[in-house]
Every structure is written in C-alpha cells, then in structure tokens.
Swiss-Prot record:
NCBIfam families: citD, PRK13253.1. This is Citrate lyase acyl carrier protein. Covalent carrier of the coenzyme of citrate lyase. InterPro entries: CitD, Mal_deCO2ase/Cit_lyase_ACP. The keyword tRNA-binding does not apply. Keywords: Cytoplasm, Phosphoprotein. Belongs to the CitD family. The lineage of its organism: Bacteria, Bacillati, Bacillota, Bacilli, Lactobacillales. It is found in: Cytoplasm.
C-alpha cells in the first residue's frame, strides 16, 4: 500500500493510541513511540505496529505513535485506519484483515 499523505487515527484518551502515518522518502518503515508503559511493552507495541504495516503491504512510512495504555486490538485498529487514510483508500478488505487472526 502506498502512503500518499499524512493521516491520523485515535486519540490521547486513556486506553487509546494516537497514530500518525506519513510518507517516507527513504523507502523504509520508521516507528517512533511515546508510551507511559514503554519500558514494559514498548518493543511489543512497535512489533505489533510493524507487523500490521507488513500485513497491509506498506513498505515505506514514518509512524509516530503516542500510547496511553491501548490494548493490542486498539493498536492494530488505529494503525489500519491511519494507513488507509494516508493511502487515500476508503474501502477495507475485511476478509484479508480477518485472515490475520490465526
């Protein structure tokens, strides 16, 4: 999926995550995380965001995430929403997304 513009999903409310996805000219995925639970779960959150991007076939993006204690399902949903907005796609392939849940 090609990231064309900057897009945001989520909020800074408790138990949520605000994620910003932007194009990356370096053709890599970079993830910046600000989390109150970074020492405990930072690596897991980064890995979950990265895997979601891979599942969406994103090869180049700058991602900034501000976590306020979001669950995995929320992190994944916010990432999916931000990527689709950044790519300018308003249709979701629910069968494909459901196939990730093995």
């Amino acid at each position: 999926m090609d990231i064309k513009q900057t897009a945001v999903a989520g909020s800074l409310e408790s138990s949520d995550l605000m994620i910003t996805v932007s194009p990356n000219d370096e053709q890599t995925i970079t993830i910046t995380l600000d989390s109150s639970v970074e020492k405990q779960f930072g690596n897991h959150i980064r890995q979950l965001i990265h895997q979601t991007l891979v599942n969406l076939k994103v090869t180049a993006a700058k991602v900034e995430a501000v976590d306020k204690g979001a669950l995995d399902c929320t992190i994944q949903a916010r990432t999916i929403a931000a990527v689709h907005r950044a790519a300018g796609i308003d249709q979701y392939d629910w069968k494909e997304i459901d196939s990730w849940n093995v």
